[in-house]
């Protein structure tokens, strides 16, 4: 049953152990130039990627709001009307359009200022649940996402984290490993949408069926000036820099519709030719793929237990645990808590940084405009950068406790942090233009002790779940 309630103002004080919890907020949008973490303080980085939520939709946390987090309780539609955000379940059955076209609809770019006016969310295509209107103007029932609130209140919450791209999951996951969705090195084009695969195949990368295509967008923001291409790209990724430097990595993702396949929209390496390698029985089977891509997302829990965590890990959920509107069963907060608790309760806690983020805004209302919408220019990213806000939590013994970061971040910031941590060169894409999260850390502070995150479902639930993994969205 879908619960519906209009959000009203909330005043709350959180008391922990008899002491008032005070969150510190920091403003500003300049790119940080401070140095990377001291050698050895961070030896492992884990990037947990959830799906399709905006900050206003997912983080109506009264504690964060009271502390100054930039979270709105209402929005403006294309008619100039104020719409109060309405409460809905995390697993509510609707899935707004989140294509590049949907970005343009919600953005309503001003020809005068070159900024999004953020008054077009009502123009996004969506089929709302029966009896509900304006479902794009909604927020998730806080009781269903309390693990996220607990983590964000304890460590660092970034309220100005933006997806780098202006579109859906497949290109977003390319930016999360490469800082680009360009088809080749040096190209000024970007893959801008989820691929059109033949017959609805789950494989949307280099192992997609013949005839599959993905749209390209040019520096003018035009998706029709270039013919669509097969969704298989060739350029450097962060994994190449790691391997060249002798660093280890793994990419954990559930298998797809059939044994041996993967949910391609959500798996960055599948669309990179030199990682996918040879195609065997319609599936990537190259040496890089076989060595580093693990088609079982819960294997990260086992690897932590067995002291086999790699230096850099990406963690992709099943559809049910993804938070993706219309696909999730609401178990996402427990899934994330399981991974965080596994690390926190292990020896890895002492030298690990965990980033929890969401791959795109999901077509859901958010009131903060992107920092720049680059069109008709010679600057990197022109035509497809930047997208809307997505949540981000930074978890580490060296993360600032109870801190709200209002510095501008994007997916390139994650790459840049990893580059600095392991003394890697820059890829020269989104990472080159990004900050490195240095405002979120204090490497001179006494390391924070880990505080276990309460959640409705424990790690055993996910380890023992024998249901076939659900596939990603195909829109």
Go through each PLM region and give its residues.
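N-terminal pro-sequences and low-complexity stem/linker regions of secreted or lumenal proteins
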Residues: 26-475
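Bacterial N-terminal signal peptides
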Residues: 10-23
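Short, low-complexity disordered leader/linker segments with a strong preference
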Residues: 4-6, 22-30
């Amino acid at each position: 049953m879908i619960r519906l309630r209009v959000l009203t103002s909330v005043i709350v004080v959180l008391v922990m152990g008899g002491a008032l919890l005070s969150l510190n907020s920091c403003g500003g949008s300049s790119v940080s130039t401070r140095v990377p973490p001291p050698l050895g303080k961070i030896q492992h980085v884990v990037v947990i990627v959830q799906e399709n939520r905006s900050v206003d939709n997912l983080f109506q946390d009264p504690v964060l709001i009271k502390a100054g987090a930039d979270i709105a309780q209402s929005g403006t539609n294309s008619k100039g009307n104020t719409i109060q955000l309405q409460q809905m379940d995390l697993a509510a059955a609707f899935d707004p359009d989140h294509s590049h076209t949907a970005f343009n609809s919600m953005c309503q770019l001003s020809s005068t200022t070159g900024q999004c006016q953020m008054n077009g969310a009502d123009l996004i295509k969506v089929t709302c649940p029966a009896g509900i209107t304006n479902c794009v103007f909604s927020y998730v029932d806080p009781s269903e996402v309390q693990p996220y609130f607990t983590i964000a209140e304890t460590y660092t919450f970034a309220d100005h984290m933006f997806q780098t791209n202006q579109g859906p999951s497949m290109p977003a996951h390319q930016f999360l490993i490469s800082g680009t969705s360009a088809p080749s090195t040096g190209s000024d084009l970007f893959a801008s949408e989820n691929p059109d695969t033949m017959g609805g195949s789950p494989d949307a990368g280099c192992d997609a069926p013949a005839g599959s295509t993905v749209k390209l967008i040019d520096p003018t923001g035009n998706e029709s000036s270039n013919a669509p291409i097969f969704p298989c790209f060739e350029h450097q990724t962060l994994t190449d820099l790691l391997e060249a430097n002798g660093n280890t990595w793994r990419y954990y993702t559930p298998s797809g519709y059939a044994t041996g396949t993967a949910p391609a929209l959500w798996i960055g390496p599948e669309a990179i030719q030199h990682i996918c390698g040879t195609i065997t029985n319609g599936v990537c089977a190259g040496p890089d793929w076989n060595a580093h891509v693990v088609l079982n997302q819960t294997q990260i829990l086992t690897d932590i237990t067995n002291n086999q965590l790699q230096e850099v890990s990406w963690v992709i959920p099943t559809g049910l645990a993804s938070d993706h509107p219309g696909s999730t069963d609401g178990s996402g907060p427990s899934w994330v808590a399981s991974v965080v608790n596994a690390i926190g309760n292990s020896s890895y806690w002492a030298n690990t940084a965990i980033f929890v983020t969401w791959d795109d805004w999901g077509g859901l209302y958010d009131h903060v405009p992107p920092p720049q919408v680059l069109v008709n220019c010679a600057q990197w990213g022109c035509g497809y950068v930047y997208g809307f806000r997505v949540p981000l939590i930074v978890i580490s013994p060296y993360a600032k406790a109870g801190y709200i970061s209002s510095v501008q971040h994007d997916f390139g910031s994650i790459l840049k942090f990893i580059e600095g941590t392991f003394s890697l060169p820059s890829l020269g894409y989104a990472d080159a233009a990004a900050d490195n999260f240095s405002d979120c850390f204090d490497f001179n502070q006494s390391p924070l002790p880990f505080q276990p995150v309460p959640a409705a479902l424990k790690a055993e639930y996910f380890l023992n779940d024998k249901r076939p993994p659900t596939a990603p969205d195909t829109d």
